[in-house]
């Protein structure tokens, strides 16, 4: 992203700040700025250019707990580290941030040291199923036939209410859902239904019956935090994760979903969303911001995993804020900011590829997969080592153009099935842009980029591999970094052992 006079900001931990660092590239090298906070306190990192000077700063809503009651001394519980290097941003990140990341509670374990079901480690493809009608069921079964099964279906609208409303009153479930779950599982696939782990609709029966007002996050004046989404126009309240009322609701939902619907676990949305400072006097945390938000969700998910998650089931969430890596078996990466002036770079896999499983790249198109971004997303998704797809299967066979996109996804899925020796626990090393016959195209919602891209990975055994993907509909002959030529057919990928 180009730096301008308008401040660029990153709200940690959340979708637009998965890690605690900002870097600035220039002709002289890279400047590195990182508040190294092992407690994952909420913070806003800002960078701004004015009159030729660039300023970096961290803004926080302080916790009352940061002031010592005896000495009245106020301490910010982290140290900010800065540095400069003649190399680029990737060198700075690996040199300085990765050692910090591996010293934190969330980055200390490799993927193999975590208790993740083997079936998930071997997963390659996700679908986003919506509703329970015949159109959806037909598309789901066609996807299983077309891609060869072993698909994870992330299921929305399995209850009786519209999106972003009536949270957390999902039960009773639509009676059509459990038989569909059974059918999909009998075909060798998995089903994970959606719930929200952060919002409570104040108009629900449960908000009154379970005293939801005592669980709500509060502003300094005692007012509620409310969020209104265009999907429902409902003023949902933001719930404080420290509340035992809310924790019990989430744990009860986990039990009910698994026991009554027989799913393979559940998806809990917005746990990794940006925290709010909470000033509720009846909550068991110091007023203000600080570490309570992360600690509360960490403890909630630890209890869920220890006492409520059935054998070989999983729990996953949206986005990839680093501190939530141990809380979930896999993270759905779909909200990363991007536009023609803001390009996504492989910063997260550079740091955490051997620590975490992810699926998707950014939001898959909602209505049309033929505009170019779907193909680009899945190329990048593959190269980042992420599990592919997260697409609505109803979109894949509506016409010949859509079928071609489905073919590309199948080609990459079949290739990925043979790469678990690298992608499961391996390290992303570097992005590769082959030269030669490698056209630049204007990708819808992303901007200009090459049709052929690549990446170098290192397997857990230390073996280096290069992947190259051609997202174009014609064959190209390109030159690799070692000077060798590679001819690559349309909508395919290749593995090259180094």
Walk through the language-model features, giving the residues of each.
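Active-site-proximal substrate-binding groove within the catalytic cores of carbohydrate-active enzymes
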Residues: 59, 70-78, 293-490
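Active-site-adjacent "subsite" loops/lids of carbohydrate-active enzymes
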Residues: 175-183, 190-261, 337, 342-351
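Surface-exposed amphipathic alpha-helices with a cationic face
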Residues: 144, 178-189, 301-310
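Short, acidic/polar
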Residues: 132-146, 246-259, 374
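Hydrophobic faces of well-ordered beta-strands that scaffold small-molecule active sites
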Residues: 125-127, 151-155, 191-194, 266-268, ...
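Carbohydrate-recognition beta-sandwich/jelly-roll modules
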Residues: 1-152, 170, 183, 187-190, ...
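Active-site neighborhood of glycoside hydrolase catalytic domains
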Residues: 238-330, 341
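Aromatic- and acidic-residue-enriched carbohydrate-binding clefts of CAZyme catalytic domains
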Residues: 152-175, 206-241, 274-298
């Amino acid at each position: 992203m180009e730096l301008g006079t308008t401040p660029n900001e990153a709200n940690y931990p959340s979708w637009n700040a998965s890690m605690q660092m900002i870097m600035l590239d220039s002709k002289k090298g890279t400047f590195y700025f990182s508040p190294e906070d092992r407690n994952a306190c909420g913070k806003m990192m800002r960078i701004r250019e004015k009159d030729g000077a660039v300023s970096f700063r961290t803004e926080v809503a302080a916790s009352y707990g940061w002031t010592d009651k005896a000495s009245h001394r106020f301490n910010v519980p982290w140290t900010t580290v800065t540095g400069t290097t003649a190399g680029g941003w990737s060198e700075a990140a690996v040199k300085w941030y990765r050692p910090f990341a591996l010293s934190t509670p969330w980055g200390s374990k490799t993927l193999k040291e975590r208790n993740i079901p083997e079936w998930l480690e071997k997963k390659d493809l996700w679908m986003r199923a919506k509703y329970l009608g015949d159109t959806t069921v037909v598309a789901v079964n066609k996807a299983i036939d077309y891609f060869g099964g072993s698909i994870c279906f992330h299921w929305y609208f399995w209850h009786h209410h519209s999106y972003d409303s009536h949270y957390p009153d999902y039960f009773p479930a639509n009676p059509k859902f459990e038989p569909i779950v059974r059918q999909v599982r009998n075909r060798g696939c998995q089903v994970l239904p959606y719930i929200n782990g952060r919002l409570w609709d104040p108009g629900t029966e449960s908000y009154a019956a379970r005293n939801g007002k005592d669980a709500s996050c509060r502003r300094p004046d005692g007012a509620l935090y409310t969020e209104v989404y265009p999907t429902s126009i409902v003023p949902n309240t933001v719930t404080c994760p420290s509340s035992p009322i809310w924790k019990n609701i989430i744990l009860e939902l986990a039990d009910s979903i698994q026991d009554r619907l027989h799913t393979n676990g559940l998806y809990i949305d917005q746990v990794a969303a940006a925290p709010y400072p909470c000033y509720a006097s009846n909550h068991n945390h110091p007023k203000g911001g600080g570490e309570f938000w992360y600690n509360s969700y960490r403890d909630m998910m630890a209890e869920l995993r220890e006492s409520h998650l059935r054998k070989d089931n999983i729990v996953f969430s949206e986005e990839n804020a680093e501190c939530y890596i141990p809380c979930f078996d896999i993270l759905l990466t779909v909200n990363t900011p991007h536009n023609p002036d803001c390009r996504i770079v492989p910063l997260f896999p550079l740091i955490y590829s051997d620590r975490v499983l992810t699926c998707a790249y950014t939001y898959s198109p909602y209505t049309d997969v033929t505009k170019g971004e779907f193909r680009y997303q899945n190329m990048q998704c593959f190269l980042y080592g992420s599990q592919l797809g997260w697409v609505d299967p109803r979109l894949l066979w509506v016409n010949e153009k859509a079928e071609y996109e489905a073919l590309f996804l199948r080609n990459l899925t079949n290739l990925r099935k043979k790469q678990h020796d690298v992608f499961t626990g391996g390290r992303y090393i570097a992005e590769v842009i082959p030269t030669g016959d490698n056209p630049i195209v204007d990708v819808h919602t992303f901007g200009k980029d090459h049709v052929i891209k690549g990446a170098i990975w290192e397997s857990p055994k230390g073996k280096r591999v290069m992947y190259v993907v051609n997202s174009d509909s014609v064959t190209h002959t390109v030159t690799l970094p070692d000077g060798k030529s590679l001819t690559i057919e349309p909508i395919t990928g290749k593995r090259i052992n180094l």
